[in-house]
């Protein structure tokens, strides 16, 4: 284990895995299931952690680094009441980096889970939508629509 991995493990161990999940329910605008992806990463299950994140986010490598965590998920963390909150952004970035090292990608994750969505995909196939905005929300919307066979145009 490298020193960096040791520090990340310490950050993950600091998470209480709350049942109410204020970091996810109140803090994260995407609703990322933060305690679950941290739990999987702690157990060394990077693919499961990455799959959990990719259910709600297509930009974990970016969001893990540039999201205003202190105002959002980390700002809602129970640990922050009496001390430092869990360093969620660093953990999310670590999961993304490890997933890339292991050759995981959103395409592979979606292909693995696509059989459940075939009926919905058939209904939506060939539909077109316009999305106003090319920021994280617009790009995420476009990616999830594309997964379901919808052609989107970002303006």
Regions found by a protein language model. Give the residues of each.
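N-terminal Rossmann-like FAD-binding beta1-loop-alpha1 element of flavoenzymes
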Residues: 127-153
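Ferredoxin-type iron-sulfur electron-transfer modules and their immediate structural context
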Residues: 1-123
């Amino acid at each position: 284990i490298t020193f960096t991995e040791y520090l990340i493990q310490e950050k993950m161990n600091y998470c209480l895995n709350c049942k109410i999940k204020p970091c996810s329910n109140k803090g994260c605008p995407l609703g990322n299931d933060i305690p679950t992806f941290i739990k999987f990463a702690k157990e060394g299950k990077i693919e499961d952690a990455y799959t959990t994140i990719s259910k709600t986010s297509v930009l974990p490598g970016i969001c893990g680094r540039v999201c205003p965590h202190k105002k959002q998920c980390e700002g809602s963390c129970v640990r922050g009441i009496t001390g430092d909150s869990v360093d969620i952004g660093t953990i999310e970035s670590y999961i993304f980096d490890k997933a890339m090292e292991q050759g995981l990608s959103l395409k592979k994750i979606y292909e693995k889970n696509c059989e459940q969505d075939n009926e919905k995909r058939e209904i939506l196939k060939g539909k077109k939508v316009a999305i106003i905005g090319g920021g994280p929300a617009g790009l995420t919307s476009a990616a999830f629509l594309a997964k379901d066979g919808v052609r989107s145009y970002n303006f």
